[in-house]
Amino acid sequence: MTREEFKAIRKRLGFNQAELAELLGYGSAIRVSEFERATNPVAVPRLVAMLMMAMDETGWRPPTQEKE
């Protein structure tokens, strides 16, 4: 998955970088930013790419959690 594909899917899914980072279990949006950055891009892990593509194809979204 290219950085352009990753970013396009993230946007289609309606997530900002921080929201996607939380969903994927990353501590901050920095990792998602690294996946999308033009300079020194970090390879998107295969499992993350598969999850993004599955969510994009099926329209699945994680359930929202009510904040107390």
Predicted regions located by residue number:
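A short, Lys/Arg-rich alpha-helix, primarily the initiator
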Residues: 1-12
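Short intrinsically disordered terminal tails
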Residues: 1, 64-68
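Residues within the helices of the helix-turn-helix
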Residues: 7, 18, 33
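Core residues of bacterial helix-turn-helix
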Residues: 13, 24-25
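Short alpha-helical "recognition helix" segments of helix-turn-helix
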Residues: 20-22
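DNA major-groove recognition helix of helix-turn-helix/homeodomain DNA-binding modules
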Residues: 40-64
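Recognition helix of helix-turn-helix/homeodomain-like DNA-binding domains
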Residues: 25-42
